[in-house]
Amino acid sequence: MWYVSTRGMAPRIDFKEALFSGYAPDGGLYMPEELPQLGRETLHEWSTLSYPSLVKELCSLFIGPELIPRDDLNGTSGDTGSAAIESVQGAKNVDIIVLLPKGHCTKIQELQMTTVLRENVHVFGVEGNSDELDEPIKTVFADVAFVKKHNLMSLNSINWSRVLVQIAHHFFAYFRCAPSLDMHPLSPVEVVVPTGAAGNLAAGCIAQKMGLPIHLVVAVNSNDIIHRTIQWGDFSLSKAVKPTLASAMDIQVPYNMERIFWLLSGSDSQVIRALMEQFESTKSVSLPKELHSKLSEAVTSQSVSDEAITQTMGRCWQENQYLLCPHSAVAVSCHYQQVDRQQPSPPRCCLAPASAAKFPEAVRAARLTLDTPAEILALEHKEARCTPMRKGDDWTRMLRDTIEDLSQQWQSGLPVGLSLVVLVEHCAWCILELAGPGTKLLCDCTSTRYCVMTLKVWSLGFPKMQTPSPHPAAAAAAAAAKSLQLCPTLYHPRDGSPPGSPVPGILQARTLEWVAISFSNRESEK
């Protein structure tokens, strides 16, 4: 399987190179050169699998067996621990750089990042929003020599591996909600995707292209660039980001739309390059008529106000005693609109990305009460530490200098290992775990949106690690698998259970991040 840039000016690469990369050198995003097509027999087989097993089978279609032995992708479900920054605090082999947008995330989210006063945690409070934070990250990744020197890697949805594992959400949702897989043709299922940067939406479009009969509904808040693009072909910025209760979706530049445009254009890199270069230059572009037609056929969309978010949270609690986070409520609001119209519809699944505990402002706005965990209450009384990145500062230089300083510190005392730069998304996901003394699971299940983390994971311990497994990386992957996070799924079933019933459904598994263990191990053995 080869991977190509959406803009067509970068060399094609294999999965390993796609995994350890961010933006392509030409500014595009990596996509598979070809998509596998799945028949009815494969769908039947996959419908009986657990979520981790489904992820494993899906990944095997996109990763050559010569790169990833099957033993390296074992996994079982379970609960994650705390957020990534909490997981690695004090670890001797990890440094974390966190960039948070001051005023654009909840107080709890900010405290979770700024109250960790360990030597290996470096938090910056940026006077900017998430789109503005993307710019220095993109600039850093555009410097190919710098990226190679420091082995930098992005694990937000810029990285193909992030989108790949999200494809499994849509297959699993379909298998849980489809009335039967024996119908000809297969019955469709509607998947409502609360959308910010559009990574999960891109995953859904890929699942469609692979043969999964789903209809995608894009649910956005008042930052409605995707809604306007689908409705009228207007891919243009508003005057400013609008702060909403669903703060993780307060995004004006949904960069994964480039992947969707490329997919629906028939992989026409020339068209996409011209389109995206115009957008980057003028902040506004009208989609070509044919591309807009294909987009509106593939997905529909709705924009949801803060008032609708709070009404949905209240209604879901009243009807189901289930407390939605505001992002989940954006999706469920679309569901309620269809229910209230009493229009016939296929089974429907709403993806639910986060816990309401991190959004007390939204809970209060919905006139609901929240049983706040003691760990979150304790944050109010902790000392905080945060270095400002002010408007007018050179954020790119500050980020580069920090990465270089940390690399220099490590290189002066430890062998060079694996460095990762991560932009943390709003949903639960596992990054990487190394099996060895002093190492911990790196995961985010607490919506610490907009963070950039540099994770330095050293391969020093792999050759000497005592383990009965013939592959230390496999042991590490198995250990990481025990700490996956199950997120609740809300769906409109046909089996008689109440609409909106919470079920253990969409698992934010990040199996592919474990692949990094395998590569790190093999390089150290060489």
Language model feature labels by segment:
Residues 1-417:
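PLP-dependent amino-acid enzyme catalytic core
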Residues 420-526:
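Small-residue-rich alpha-helical packing segments, especially N-terminal targeting/signal peptides
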